[in-house]
């Protein structure tokens, strides 16, 4: 027959064992939750970099590499009557895919506006293609107010159904295309940055003779 002291020891040992098991279970749950959180953050960060591309990447197209720029899909136009790229042959066209809720786009905007001011009279046409990220950005009147508030003077066209976005195979905001006087895509930049190179490309295309 067990003594009271022995029973007390058994209870204490059993309680200690249960405590250790519970702690191990909690630790395991914590590790699993931590792994899930890290994986989710990693995915979200990768997705953000893919869509917003803050560090930027550029590509130049020459000769046979250059393709004719797809026509802009029909949408609501702000600051202009509807524009057709075919009607802009003989001018260099800068097409920027953006959305007013994108902070990367807002960081890029002062440069795009300055190029419009500096080179419009020299043969550059800037067109903003507004491809919304969120549902509320599809409201045309809201977009009109944002365009006015941001001091954008160049034409902006809505792309709420992403037809133009898909035609140009855009992956993120902002994305800039430079189209030469023959209507061919000659340069592309995704994300922020590389503004000096963008301006050099504009100057180079403006200097080219129309063939």
Across the structure, where does each feature detected by a protein language model lie?
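Thiol/disulfide oxidoreductase modules built on the thioredoxin-like
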Residues: 148-153, 158-203
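A short beta-strand-turn-helix
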Residues: 71-93, 119
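Short active-site neighborhood of thiol/selenol oxidoreductases, capturing the structured segment around
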Residues: 83-106, 126
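Short, hydrophobic alpha-helical segments
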Residues: 202-210
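Loop/turn elements at helix/coil->beta-strand transitions in domains of secreted/extracellular proteins
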Residues: 89-93, 121-125, 151-154, 181
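N-terminal targeting signals for export/organelle localization
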Residues: 2-71, 211
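Structural microenvironment flanking redox-active thiols in thiol-disulfide oxidoreductases
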Residues: 106-150, 157-167, 200
């Amino acid at each position: 027959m067990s003594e009271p002291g022995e029973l007390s020891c058994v209870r204490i040992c059993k309680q200690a064992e249960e405590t250790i098991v519970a702690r191990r279970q909690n630790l395991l749950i914590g590790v699993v939750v931590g792994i899930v959180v890290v994986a989710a953050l990693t995915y979200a960060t990768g997705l953000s970099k893919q869509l917003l591309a803050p560090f930027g990447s550029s590509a130049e197209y020459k000769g046979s590499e250059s393709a004719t720029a797809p026509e802009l899909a029909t949408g609501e136009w702000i600051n202009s009557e509807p524009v057709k790229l075919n009607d802009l042959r003989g001018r260099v066209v800068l097409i920027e895919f953006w959305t007013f809720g994108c902070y990367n786009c807002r960081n890029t905007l002062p440069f795009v506006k300055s190029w419009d001011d500096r080179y419009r009279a020299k043969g550059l046409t800037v067109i903003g293609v507004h491809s919304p990220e969120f549902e509320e950005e599809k409201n045309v009147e809201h977009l009109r107010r944002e365009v006015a508030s941001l001091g954008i003077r160049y034409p902006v066209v809505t792309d709420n159904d992403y037809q133009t976005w898909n035609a140009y195979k855009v992956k993120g905001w902002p994305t800039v295309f430079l189209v030469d006087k023959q209507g061919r895509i000659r340069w592309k930049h995704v994300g922020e940055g590389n503004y000096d190179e963008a301006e050099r490309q504009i100057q180079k295309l403006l200097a080219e003779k129309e063939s």
